[in-house]
Structure formats: structure tokens, C-alpha cells
Amino acid sequence: MAARLVQRCSRLLAASTAYAPATHTHIHECMKVCHPAQPVLPCSSLHSSSLCRHKDKALTKEQTVSSVPEHGKFESVLESLSSVEELLQLGVDREISGNQAAMIITQVSKVLMESKAQGGSVVQDERFQQLLVQAHNQISTIWNGNLVSLLKRLYILGIREDNKQLQAVENEVRWRLRRLSFKSLVQLSDLYVTFTRSPEQKHLVSDLVKNLELRWTEIEDAKSVVTLMTRVGFISKALMEKLEDKALEYAEQFTPDEMRKVALALAAQNRRTVPLLRALSYHLVQRHIGLSPAVVVDLAFAYGKLNFHQTQVFQKMASDLLPKVPEMSANDIARCVKSFAYLKWSNLPLFEAFAQASIDQSEKFTVPQLCNLVLAFGRLNFQPSKREEFYSMMHQKLHAELDLLDPYLLVDIVWSLCVLRQVDSSYISKVLEPGLYSRFFTDSSPRSANYRLKLAHINATALLEHPEYTGPHLPNESISTTHAVTANRKLSPLQSGLQEVLRELFPVEGTCRCGVNTVYGWYIDGEVVLDSDNKPLSLMDLEAPHLPHSQGKKPLPEGTRRFAFVAWDFPNFNSRSKDLLGRFVLTRRHLQAAGFLVVEVPYYEWLDLKSEWQKSAYLKDKINKVVAEEMAR
């Protein structure tokens, strides 16, 4: 009972001492709270910081009310002055407080920014230095909002980080963090990521983030969410998770530019937050607002980086971007087409416009930007309608700087030209020189392993599609090392299911090979040789030039056909399409050039087959169709 009395009385006494000493009336009020009907406060309310906070708020309110008229008059005087000279002289002509000195410094910085003038001479001015001293001497009297603005303006004016007055302002801000409004915390977040350099400033940022983690529920507008996500979200994972929740809450209020910033913030941290991305996509599609090229380019980059597919958003991007392609810069076109290629999404009118823009503005496109176009077209197997003009321009520019390209980029470009059927002997010989390809075979990194595979594909292009080529080739021992890439790959359910059915369809040992690594760098799910009556032959004695180490020497009998079974999974196709990506078009071409009849098994047909009998009948039907097509040629 005594504890409850002390607890309740302390709250009333703390509030009353802010204005007047205790009186008989106060004591009487304290006695009244002993009535059992009054609610019991939690013990945490007795904490001394809570009592002090009541007093601080009361005193602050009293000071604010008394100084509002004075502040309003001085602010009107500041707004009437339009030059730096007048503002500096104001501090000399009249007696000012530290708060007013901070306001003058802030206004001086604004005028300098508007006039785009240099602030070096102003900072050295004796009157400006006197303003700094005045603000420093009375720093405790500067209002919170003015203090944050002062700190920002001192950074913008280029005040050195070891300046005594600047350090005093930083320390004061750090001590006041808990008393600053949430809006001021957001302003500090926007400020400090740009200007943080010294250890003290980094400590302030750390304290700022801790305060934001505790007070994130005070966010009341979409702009604050965007600012915090882009400026400090990467510092704290816990804060970023809270900000994502708030972004989901305010997604409907985001402008397209704010959606762009949120998407970029997620992409920068590789945070694939699907609910938030879906919400952004929904509101982008629902609003009948045109997207600017800058917004489309950044959104495409973010979606590509996060591998997030949303067809309706892509269609809106394309429709909004198509009429503006002639006005886009070469860099924006290159970035946009690269992002869409990552997403495996091809819009024919938009890509035609990109190709036409590169032809019309060829002098503005650098070689790296043209390389982005070629890589994207190769990945998607896109051929522009004006291919002769486009490739003529591209070859002319590319040959001029071929020796200057990074080896990795050079291999990518030549490989893409192989896909697009635009490679010639000069490109092939360049990448198959021992001095260039040897660096990829001595490097054991996963990245180099992928490029060794691409070199095998380029070598296969020279062997199968360019009989006139007389330059260097990859040695057999180098090609054998590329098999490790596919040998360690886990089979997809489609591949394992196909191989299982093939073994049942051709049960005689030696008549069917499954999981074949070829010298061309391609993986075949199954291989059989059938005679003219569609009966399988033993593969052991037959020559197999596609194998690294073939034991058979006997040529194929007349009338026999060699079949290659390849499974096409969902990732092998363009998004929302039945068109293969360029890599797998090249696979089919090379296998056909090597003498195979290719039996393609796409996922969208295989999934409809439920029983083993259906799958066996499906493969037999596929074989008959391929034979019929071959005979019809």
C-alpha cells in the first residue's frame, strides 16, 4: 500500500515541480490518489528518466511559447535579405543569440547554393567566423530543428571536420538525439551518409541508427520510409526489416520515383522481399501514370538484379518506354536492354527500337555499350529486322577496339556472335590463341569454369559451322577439363525422368547412352542409333566423333540415324514464351551440324504425361516426327 502511494504521488509531484513548489493543495491531491478505485501504474513509471522528461517537456514548451514572437520577427527579417553581404552584416548590426546565429548561417548557405557561388571566401570572412563563435558559445540554446539545419549547412559549406565549432555541433546533436523529432532524425539520416568521414561522425551515425531502430513506429509518411531505406537501411538489417514493413504499409502512396528508389535500395542489398516487390508491381500497373525513361531503366535493373518477374509491369515499362526510345541516351539504352536480358524477357517492338536507335545514333554509342546490346541479343536470340545495317555498324566499331577489350568480355562477345551467326574467322582466332585461352584453363574459379565452357562452344562453332577456318583450335586435353562443369551438375526432375524412360525404352545394354558429355561442350541426356527399321544398334563398336575418347571404329551403316535426346526445362526458355534462349538454340544447331537428329523434350509437354506408358509412347512419336522432318528436307 505504501509503495503504491509513493508511486502515484511521485508522478504528480514531478509534474507540479516544473511550475511551482509543493503546497497544501498538492499534498491533498496526493492523498486523494490512495483511493482503491484508481488504476495502478506499472513500476517502470517510477523511473527517474521519465520524471526528468516530464520536466524537460514542460520547460521546453514554456521557452518555445515565450520565444515564438521574437523568432517570427527575426525570421521575417532574414527572408527580406537576399544577399550574403546583407546576411553577414545583420550579425554585426544587431545583437543576436546563438539560435539566431545558426539561422543566419543556414540562410547564407541557402543563398550561396541558389546563386551557385563558391563558399570559400564567405567561410573565411570575419563576420561569418563571429557567427560560428556565437553559435558555439550558446549552442545549448539553439533549437533542435535549427541545430540539425546548422550541421547540414556547415557540411555543405565545406567546414573542415577538425573545426572546433563543427565538432561542438556534432557533439550537441549526438547528446540531443533522443529529444529530436523523428523528422529531424530522418534529415540527419539523409545528411550523414553523404558526409560521414571522421570516427566521431561514424559514432554519431551508429547512435542515430540505434535511435531509429527504437523509434521506427513513429514513421508517418512515405517520404520518410524512402529516405531511411535508401540512406541507412544498409547499415542495420533489423532496421531494414522494419522499414520494409512500413514500405508495404505506404506502398499505395509512393510516387513512381519513390518506387524506383525503394526497388533500388532492395537491389543494392540483394533483398528479394517478394511481398513488397509484388505491392510495388501492383501499384505500378494499377495507376495510369506514364513512367519516365529514368524510372523504367532503374526499375528494370532492380527487377533484373533481384530476378523478380512480373509480366504486367514489364509490358507497362515497354509501352511507356517505346515512344521515348529515340530520346534516350546510349547509356540508358544499354542498361535497359541488359536488364531485360537478365530477366529473359523480350519485347520485339522495344528491342527493334533499341536496335534502330543504335543505328541512328551510332556515333554516340561506345564499344562497351554496343557490347551490351550484342550480349543481350545473343542471350535472347533476338535478330533485328535491319540486321545488315546493325551488324555492319557493330563489326566496324568492334574490330577497331578488339585488342583493347577485357578477355572475359571478348569471350562473351565472340560467344554471342556465334549464337547470332555473326562470328567470323578473325573473332574465333582471337579467342582461341593460346596466349588468351590459357589464362582460363589455369584459373580454378567457378567464373573461369563457365568461360572454359564458352571457349569449347566457340571451338565447336569453328569445327562445325566454319569449315574454312584454319586458325588455332583448343587442344583435346583442354576440352576434357570442361566436362567437369556438367559432370558435377545435379540433374533436374525432367532430365532424370527422361533418362529413366530411355533406359526402359531401349533396355538392351549398349544401345543407349545417357548423360553424354560431348567434345562440343554440350550435354546430351540420351543418345541412340536406329537403323532404317527404327531398331536400336549397339553403340560400343560404332565411331563416335562427338566423344572425347571413342573406342568404336566402325562407321555408321547406311540408312542408320544417330539421335540426341535433350530436355528443355523452364529456365531454358524466354520468359512467358516457348522460344529457347540463345544458348540452347546454339546447342540444337551444333548437335544437328554434328550429324544428330535432335529429339527435343520441352517441360510443357512432358508435364502432361502421367504414366510410364504415355512417356514411352511420347518419345516414340517424337522420334517418328524427327525422322519425317529429316526425310522431308
UniProtKB/Swiss-Prot annotation:
InterPro entries: FAST_2, FAST_kinase, FAST_Leu-rich, RAP. One of its GO terms (cellular component) is mitochondrial matrix. Signal peptide: none annotated. GO terms for biological process: mitochondrial mRNA processing; mRNA metabolic process; regulation of mitochondrial mRNA stability. Residues 563-621 form the RAP domain. Pfam families: FAST_1 (PF06743), FAST_2 (PF08368), RAP (PF08373). It comes from the Eukaryota. Keywords: Mitochondrion, Transit peptide. It is found in: Mitochondrion matrix. Plays a role in processing of mitochondrial RNA precursors and in stabilization of a subset of mature mitochondrial RNA species. May play a role in cell cycle progression. Belongs to the FAST kinase family. This is FAST kinase domain-containing protein 4. It comes from Xenopus tropicalis (Western clawed frog). The gene is tbrg4.
